Amino acid sequence: KLRRKITHTFFIHKTFGNYFSKSVHMHHLTSYFRRKIVPLGETYNTYINMKQTINERIQALRLILKSKSISAFIIPSTDPHLSEYVAPHWKIREWISGFTGSAGTVVILDDKAGLWTDSRYFLQAAQQLEGTDITLYKEMLPETPTITDFLCQNIKPGETIGIDGKMFSVEQVEQMRRKLEAENIHLEICGDLSGEIWKERPGMPNTPAFIYELKYAGKSCQEKIEAIRTKLKMQGTDGLFLSSLDEIAWTLNLRGS
């Protein structure tokens, strides 16, 4: 009853030393806190603890990197199919950084860390990274170095940068390797190091795939495969390799949940 009767309220929100005062309608409170990435009802101490947890995860990964003589580790948002929207099992970048946007890459060094993301997420990333050891790098701005340029500036010749090769295309790896080797920096495919510290990681999706009905798909998978073969023949190509989940699902009329 009290919530329904109140039309305005004045409140002070403290976030890492900054104070925000705002006079708002009561029904705007939830959206305000959502923009601040602090759910309504969550305490300030819980918010602080979340940031501390992110920093602890980063430090744990740094210890693994040090044990393997790796000076930096690159964590993209993708899964092994290079999807932008991934299953919880593959949300490694989100887990290590606290940033929940669909696109972004985290780079962890011994003394610094950064997140690169595009303009869709500049505001969200700034809010979610606040209080962590991670610096936001806004992609495509003149003053923002690319990840490779950043690494060349911060990694010494002879040192090694690690990646999980499953999460990158061959082209991406080749481009990075060319630039890094020009600076005598090594690129090593060393597996999923983050998984070694993510103790409560969700399991791999195991729900069954199902056939998408022809009345919705429009064409059978046989028709689609024959159309692809016709295109390949026209271009003098022997075969086509598909790894993207949406392309596989479309071609074979498969869906999942």
Model regions and ranges:
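Terminal domain-start leader segments
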Residues: 44-257
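Extreme N-terminal basic, low-complexity initiation segments
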Residues: 1-13, 214
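Short, intrinsically disordered low-complexity segments
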Residues: 2-3, 16, 33-34, 56, ...
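Short, Lys/Arg-enriched N-terminal segments with co-localized hydrophobic residues
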Residues: 32-49
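Short hydrophobic alpha-helical segments enriched in small aliphatic residues
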Residues: 9, 14, 24-29
